[in-house]
């Protein structure tokens, strides 16, 4: 990594846009160099000034979450918009999320759906999942199910949780606890927090699998002791799932 950083630095100093971006990524992640979030932001700004879509997207991310700078939703929207207009799929999805949730400006659901669709067409699996979530909230269950299935088949970890809920309860499909358990288990193996919460519940209550309170306690303690990423906690449904898990663990520990 150190050698790569040296090459990136030389390239960046000569004006290579890609080198500026890669050097920023190294500074942001502490790869081959000491982590320096503010320096990462400087390099992203330099490459964004000449129109690099990836850098524009990462600037949006940095301002959305306050990484190396003060959190600023309005600026995040600006950078996501610029990157999205240059065809950056993840920025299209992130812009849609900001618009759908009214971050950085008034909520604009119509524009959000436009960018979700564009993002999905550009290959964003997250956008498929997000479209499914909003369709579910609006009561368009068949549409939600279709989006979730497409996202799950493409490997989106959150879609395993969404589909698992549908099979557990019987929403738009025939109720199938075993299928729900299998989906939660697969999503948990990918690290999805919501799936991990549901998997623990399955073991505790015997949903789709033999009841195993010891396994539930073991997995529950591990999850509740973990320091979770802030963006994991912002996933749709994550806070309610964690709250239900805490209540379940109180019951299991007594």
Task: Describe the predicted segments one by one.
Residues 11, 26, 47, 62, ...:
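TPR/TPR-like alpha-solenoid repeats
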Residues 110, 157-228, 233:
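Ankyrin-repeat and related helical/solenoid repeat scaffolds used for protein-protein interactions
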Residues 20-29, 56-65, 94-101, 105, ...:
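Hydrophobic face of amphipathic alpha-helices that form TPR/SEL1-like repeat modules
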Residues 198-201, 229-253:
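TPR/TPR-like alpha-solenoid helical repeat scaffolds
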Residues 13-16, 29-31, 36, 49-52, ...:
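Short helix-capping/linker turns of helical repeat alpha-solenoids
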């Amino acid at each position: 990594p150190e050698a790569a950083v040296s090459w990136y630095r030389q390239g960046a100093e000569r004006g290579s846009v890609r080198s500026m971006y890669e050097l920023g990524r190294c500074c942001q992640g502490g790869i081959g160099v000491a982590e320096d979030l503010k320096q990462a932001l400087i390099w992203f700004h330099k490459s964004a000034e000449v129109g690099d879509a990836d850098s524009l997207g990462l600037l949006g991310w940095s301002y959305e979450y306050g990484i190396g700078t003060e959190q600023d939703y309005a600026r995040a929207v600006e950078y996501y918009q610029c990157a999205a207009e240059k065809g950056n799929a993840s920025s299209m999805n992130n812009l849609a999320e900001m618009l759908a949730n009214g971050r950085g400006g008034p909520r604009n659901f119509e524009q959000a759906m436009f960018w979700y669709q564009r993002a999905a067409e550009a290959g964003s699996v997250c956008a498929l999942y997000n479209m499914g979530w909003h369709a579910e909230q609006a009561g368009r269950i068949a549409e939600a199910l279709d989006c979730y299935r497409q996202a799950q088949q493409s490997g989106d970890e959150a879609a395993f949780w969404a589909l698992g809920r549908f099979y557990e309860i019987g929403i738009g499909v025939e109720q199938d606890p075993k299928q729900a358990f299998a989906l939660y288990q697969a999503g948990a193996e990918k690290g999805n927090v919501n799936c991990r919460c549901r998997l623990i519940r399955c073991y505790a209550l015997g949903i789709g699998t033999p009841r195993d309170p010891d396994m539930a306690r073991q997995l529950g303690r591990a999850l509740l002791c973990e320091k979770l990423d802030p963006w994991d906690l912002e996933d749709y449904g994550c806070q309610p799932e964690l709250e239900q898990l805490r209540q379940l663990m109180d019951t299991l520990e007594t």
